Every structure is written in C-alpha cells, then in structure tokens.
Amino acid sequence: MAKVGMRERELKREKTVAKYAEKRAALKAIIANPNVSDEERWEAQMKLQKLPRDASPSRLRNRCQVTGRPHAVLRKFRLSRIKLREAAMRGDVPGLKKASW
C-alpha cells in the first residue's frame, strides 16, 4: 500500500488542478491564438509559468482508491486490477462477472 502522505499529496494535486483549470485554459488559449500580439503572448506565457507546478494535469497520477497503488488502475472503477478482482469475486461491483467462453 502507498503511504498515507502520498495519497494525500495526490488529493491535494487534484484540488489544485481543479482550482486553476479555467485560468490555465484561458492562458493557453491566448498563447495558441495566432491573432494575439507577441507581447500579449509573452505575458500569457510568463503568467502560465508562475502558476503552481501541481496545477498541471500531467502531474496527476491515477491511484487505487483502496490501496493507493499507482499501476494497473482502471479509470472506470478507480481501483487497481487486484482490488477490482477481489471486489468482483465478492459481488460488490454490479454487472461485473468473471469472463467465461
């Protein structure tokens, strides 16, 4: 299991990304707009650089909600493959059953 601090850090990053999402999108739109002057584009780039590092969505890592495991996490369930299998075998996940063909 991941340490509690790592899981808390990831939650903090999610909140930071959500907080700055609109501001980042607006600045990126200014930077990508070809009709904007070079000075305005430069100012937008500087403002974007001054935002917190954790405001970038690429800093997020999908983690298992139960264990905090960073690898093999299914987005739909937010569980790792191991915990998803355990939950499915217990019948905790509606509509999910073991494959048979």
Swiss-Prot record:
Binds 16S rRNA, required for the assembly of 30S particles and may also be responsible for determining the conformation of the 16S rRNA at the A site. Part of the 30S ribosomal subunit. Contacts proteins S3 and S10. The keyword RNA-binding applies. Keywords: Ribonucleoprotein, Ribosomal protein, RNA-binding, rRNA-binding. It comes from Hahella chejuensis (strain KCTC 2396). The lineage of its organism: Bacteria, Pseudomonadati, Pseudomonadota, Gammaproteobacteria, Oceanospirillales. The gene is rpsN. NCBIfam families: PRK08881.1. The keyword Iron does not apply. This is Small ribosomal subunit protein uS14. Belongs to the universal ribosomal protein uS14 family.
